[in-house]
Amino acid sequence: MTKATLYTKPGCVQCKMTKKDLTKKGVPFDEVDITEDHDALSFVLSLGYKQAPVVVIGQTHWSGFRPDMVRKFV
């Protein structure tokens, strides 16, 4: 299974829900706080996203709490 990258920010409810869903479904991931990592923030913005969470798995990416997308990688 390809490892995901989860871009988050503090106090983000959808970020917590996405993290919980990835963990529950056994999808391995690295979490990156975009408020502390400016390169990560620039990357997320370059993908066209302006809100967290952003999930990147291989060439696929999305924003927001999307359990339907997580299921595709289980």
List PLM regions with ranges.
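A short, hydrophobic beta-strand/beta-hairpin element that forms part of a small beta-sheet core
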Residues: 53-63
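ATP/adenylate-binding site constellation spanning eukaryotic-like Ser/Thr protein kinases
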Residues: 9, 49, 67
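Thioredoxin-like thiol-disulfide oxidoreductase module
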Residues: 33-50
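Conserved beta-strand scaffold positions in the cores of enzyme catalytic domains, especially
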Residues: 29-31, 61
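Local sequence-structure signature of Cys/Sec-based thiol-disulfide redox active-site neighborhoods
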Residues: 1-25
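Catalytic phosphate/metal-binding cores of nucleic-acid and nucleotide-processing enzymes, i.e., regions
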Residues: 24, 28-29, 41, 74
